[in-house]
C-alpha cells in the first residue's frame, strides 16, 4: 500500500485525477475508482474534501473580525506554535500557517461556545489537515466537518463513547474485557487519545494519512470503534501475559497504535470489516446520537451505558436477522422467563432456559445450559431459522422479574462466551413491536413468530403453535462456530522449521486450538515486542487487481459439488469460506488437481450445487500468505514473474479450517508443477 515516490501514475490514479479535475465528483465515484488503495499524496486533499462534503463550502471565517482574544488564547498560541515547530515548513511560511491554525481553533471555540483545553487533542486532529497545505477556509471547513461527524460527544474521561466501546469489546472478546475490568483499566484510561484524535496522537503522519484515507471514505463514524477493537485484539496475548504494574500496562496499551506501519493499514481495515460484519446493527442504530450536531434522541435513560450488563439488541433486528440469507448476524434466542410465561406465549424460535433454576436447582440448570449449546450447534448445522452464532437472552421486560435472567447473563459472560446480548425490552417489547406492525394482518410475514405450548394465548399471537428446540444432550458444551476467527487470536505462536521462498506455510497441530507461525519470509516486523501483529506475514496488495479472474461464463456455471469432489483428477478438497474484501464470507470448497485449483461456491438455495467461482493454474500462484494472529485466513496471489518483477493479476482469500494442512498440500502440488515445467 505504500506510495510509489517518483513512479509513474497507474491507470487508476490517472482515472482519479481526471475525475477530480472535471469536478462534480461524489464520494461514491471516488470510492469506485480508489477501491481501498492508498491515495497519491497530490490527490489526497481533493479526496478528503469530497469525503468530508466541504467542496464548494463558503469561507466561514469571512465575517469574523479575526480577534484572537479568548481567555485561554495564550494556551492556544503555545499549542499551535509547538505544532508548527514539529512540521517541516519553510521559515517564510511559518507565520502565515501559525495564524491560520490559531484562527481556526479560536473561531471554532467562539462559534461553538467551547472552552479550549490542550487535552481536547485538537492540535493532533489538525496535524494531518495542515500537511495538505489547505487554504484557511478549507482548513476550517475540514476541521469542523471532522469534529461534527467523527468525534463523538462526551469524548472525555468516563464519557459515554468509552462505555459503548467496553460493551463492544465484551461482545467480541469477553476474556480480554474481563481481564481489563479486574485491573480497573477502563477504555477511557487508554483509548481517550485514540478516539479524540482519530489515532493521529500516536501514529506517524504517514500512518495517520493512510488510516484517514480509508476511514473518511468509509463515511461511517462508528468504524473507528472496530479499528480500536483490532488494536486491542492483536495485543491480547501480550496484555494477558503482563505481570507489570497497572500504570505500565496502561502506558503499553495507550501507546500501542504507535507501532503501526503504513503496510499494516490494509490488514487493520480488513479485520475491522470482519468484526463489523459480526456485530449487531443495534450497536449503531441505538447510539447514532453520539455523533453529529443534533441533540435529538438524547435522553438520560439512553445515555447511561455504564450500567449495561451487555450489548442490547432491538427486537426488530432479532426478527429481521433470522429471516435474511447470507453471512449476516443471526441470533439464537434464549427465553429466560419462568415456564408458565414461556408456555403462555413465546418467540417460536426461542430456546427456553428457566433462569429460576440457577438458584433453585443448579445441576438441572447446568444440564439445561449444555442442552442449549447443543441445540444452538445443531440449529446452525441444519440451517434452521432458529439457528445463530449470537446468543440473545430475552426476559419479560419487567426489571423485578428479570433479576434472575441477569444472573444467567453474568454466568455466560463469566465463562467468556462470545457474542452475548440481551433483547431490549424483553418479551413485552416483542409483543409491542408485533402489535405496532399489525402482525395479525393477513399479508404480514411475522404472523408465525409467536407460539404457545398451553391453552392460554397472548393477545397478539398467531394461530401457529410451536415448541422450542428444547432437546437434551449428555454431550459437553459446544463453543459457538464463530470461533473460526477468534480462537486463532487466542493462541500462541510456534516456529515453522521449513521456509520456502515466496511462500508462508502456517502449520496447525491436530488439537482443538490452532497454532501459527512466528517466522516470516521477507523483512522482519519493526520493533522487538510483538505489540501489534497484523501483517507479521508477507503483505498483499490488491492495487489494480480484480479479486477474481474468471469470466462471466465461469460465474454462471453450476456444478454438482460431490460429482466434482469425486472426479479422479481431484487430489484434495478443502471445505472453506471465501472471504471478500468487505468481510462477507461464502461457504465454498477448494479443489486441487494436478495442475489447477478451483473454488466452488455453494448455492444456499440449491443444496449440493455450487458455482465455479474461480479456476486458477497452480503455476500462476506467486505467493501464499497468512496472518500470525489469524492462521486460518489464507491469501493466494496469482500472477506472472518476469524480469521486472512479479505482476499480480488476482488475489483470493479463504478461511480454511486446518489451514496448515491445506497450504502444505497446495504448496507441495505447486512444487511438483514447477519441477515438471523446469524438467
From Swiss-Prot:
Annotated region described as Disordered, given as residue ranges: 454-478
Domain Rhodanese: 327-439
UniProt cross-references to InterPro entries, sorted A to Z: Rab-GAP-TBC_dom (IPR000195), Rab-GAP_TBC_sf (IPR035969), Rhodanese-like_dom (IPR001763), Rhodanese-like_dom_sf (IPR036873), TBC1D23 (IPR039755), TBC1D23_C (IPR045799)
GO biological processes: embryonic brain development; retrograde transport, endosome to Golgi; vesicle tethering to Golgi
UniProt entry tagged with the keyword Disulfide bond: no
GO annotation, cellular component aspect: cytosol; trans-Golgi network
Domain of life where this protein originates: Eukaryota
Regions of compositional bias (Low complexity) in chain numbering: 454-468
Protein name, entry field: TBC1 domain family member 23
Organism: Gallus gallus
Encoding gene per record: TBC1D23
Amino acid at each position: 500500500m505504500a506510495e510509489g515516490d517518483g513512479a509513474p501514475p497507474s491507470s487508476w490514479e490517472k482515472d482519479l485525477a481526471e475525475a477530480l479535475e472535471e469536478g462534480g465528483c461524489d464520494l461514491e465515484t471516488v470510492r469506485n475508482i480508489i477501491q481501498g488503495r492508498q491515495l497519491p499524496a497530490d490527490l489526497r486533499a481533493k479526496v478528503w474534501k469530497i469525503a468530508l462534503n466541504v467542496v464548494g463550502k463558503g469561507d466561514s471565517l469571512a465575517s469574523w473580525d479575526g480577534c484572537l482574544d479568548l481567555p485561554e488564547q495564550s494556551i492556544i498560541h503555545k499549542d499551535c506554535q509547538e505544532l508548527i515547530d514539529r512540521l517541516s515548513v519553510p521559515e517564510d511560511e511559518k507565520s502565515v500557517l501559525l495564524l491560520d491554525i490559531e484562527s481556526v481553533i479560536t473561531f471554532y471555540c467562539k462559534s461553538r461556545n467551547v472552552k479550549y483545553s490542550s487535552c481536547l487533542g485538537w492540535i493532533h486532529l489538525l496535524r494531518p489537515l495542515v500537511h495538505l497545505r489547505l487554504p484557511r477556509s478549507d482548513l476550517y471547513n475540514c476541521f469542523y466537518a471532522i469534529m461534527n461527524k467523527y468525534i463523538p460527544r462526551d469524548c472525555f474521561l468516563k464519557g459515554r463513547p468509552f462505555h459503548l466501546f467496553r460493551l463492544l469489546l465484551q461482545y467480541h472478546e469477553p476474556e480480554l474485557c474481563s481481564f481489563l475490568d479486574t485491573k480497573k483499566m477502563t477504555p477511557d484510561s487508554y483509548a481517550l487519545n485514540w478516539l479524540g484524535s482519530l489515532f493521529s496522537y500516536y501514529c506517524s503522519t504517514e500512518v495517520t494519512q493512510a488510516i484517514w484515507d480509508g476511514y473518511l471514505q468509509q463515511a461511517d463514524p462508528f468504524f473507528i470503534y472496530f479499528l480500536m477493537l483490532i488494536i486491542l485484539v492483536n495485543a491480547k496475548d501480550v496484555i494477558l501475559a503482563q505481570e507489570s504494574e497497572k500504570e505500565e500496562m496502561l502506558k503499553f496499551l495507550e501507546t500501542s497504535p504507535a507501532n503501526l506501519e503504513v503496510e499494516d493499514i490494509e490488514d487493520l481495515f480488513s479485520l475491522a470489516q470482519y468484526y463489523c460484519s459480526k456485530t449487531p446493527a443495534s450497536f449503531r442504530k441505538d447510539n447514532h446520537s453520539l455523533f453529529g450536531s443534533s441533540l435529538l434522541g438524547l435522553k438520560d435513560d439512553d445515555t447511561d451505558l455504564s450500567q449495561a450488563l451487555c450489548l442490547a439488541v432491538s427486537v426488530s433486528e432479532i426478527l429481521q436477522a433470522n429471516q435474511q440469507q447470507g453471512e449476516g448476524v443471526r441470533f439464537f434466542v434464549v427465553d429466560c422467563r419462568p415456564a408458565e410465561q414461556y408456555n403462555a406465549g413465546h418467540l417460536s424460535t426461542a430456546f427456553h432456559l428457566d433462569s429460576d433454576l440457577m438458584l433453585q436447582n443448579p445441576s438441572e440448570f447446568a444440564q439445561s445450559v449444555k442442552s442449549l449449546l447443543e441445540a444452538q450447534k445443531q440449529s446452525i448445522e441444519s440451517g434452521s431459522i432458529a439457528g445463530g452464532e449470537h446468543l440473545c437472552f430475552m426476559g419479560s421486560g419487567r426489571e423485578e422479574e428479570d433479576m434472575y435472567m441477569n444472573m444467567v447473563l453474568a454466568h455466560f459472560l463469566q465463562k467468556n462466551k462470545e457474542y452475548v446480548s440481551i433483547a431490549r425490552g424483553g418479551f413485552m417489547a416483542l409483543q409491542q413491536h408485533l402489535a405496532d406492525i399489525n402482525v395479525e394482518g393477513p399479508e404480514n410475514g411475522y404472523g408465525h413468530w409467536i407460539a404457545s405450548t398451553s391453552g392460554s394465548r397472548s393477545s397478539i399471537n398467531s394461530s401457529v403453535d410451536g415448541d422450542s428446540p428444547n432437546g437434551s444432550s449428555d454431550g459437553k458444551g459446544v463453543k459457538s462456530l464463530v470461533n473460526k476467527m477468534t480462537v486463532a487470536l487466542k493462541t500462541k505462536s510456534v516456529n515453522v522449521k521449513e521456509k520456502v521462498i515466496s511462500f508462508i506455510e502456517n502449520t496447525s497441530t491436530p488439537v482443538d486450538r490452532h497454532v501459527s507461525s512466528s517466522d516470516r519470509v521477507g523483512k522482519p516486523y519493526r520493533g522487538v515486542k510483538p505489540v501489534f501483529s497484523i501483517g507479521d506475514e508477507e503483505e498483499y496488495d490488491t492495487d489494480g487487481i480484480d479479486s477474481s479472474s474468471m469470466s462471466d461464463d465461469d460465474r454462471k456455471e453450476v456444478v454438482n459439488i460431490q460429482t466434482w469432489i469425486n472426479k479422479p483428477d481431484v487430489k484434495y478438497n478443502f471445505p472453506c469460506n471465501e472471504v471478500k474484501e468487505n468481510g462477507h464470507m461464502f461457504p465454498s470448497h477448494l479443489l486441487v488437481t494436478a495442475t489447477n485449483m478451483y473454488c466452488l461456491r455453494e448455492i444456499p438455495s440449491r443444496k449440493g450445487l455450487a458455482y465455479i467461482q474461480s479456476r486458477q493454474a497452480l503455476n500462476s500462484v506467486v505467493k501464499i500468505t497468512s496472518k500470525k494472529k489469524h492462521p486460518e485466513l489464507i491469501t493466494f496471489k496469482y500472477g506472472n514473474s518476469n524480469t521486472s518483477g512479479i505482476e499480480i493479476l488476482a488475489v483470493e482469500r479463504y478461511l480454511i479450517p486446518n489451514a496448515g494442512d491445506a497450504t502444505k498440500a497446495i504448496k507441495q502440488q505447486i512444487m511438483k508443477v514447477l519441477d515438471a515445467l523446469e524438467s
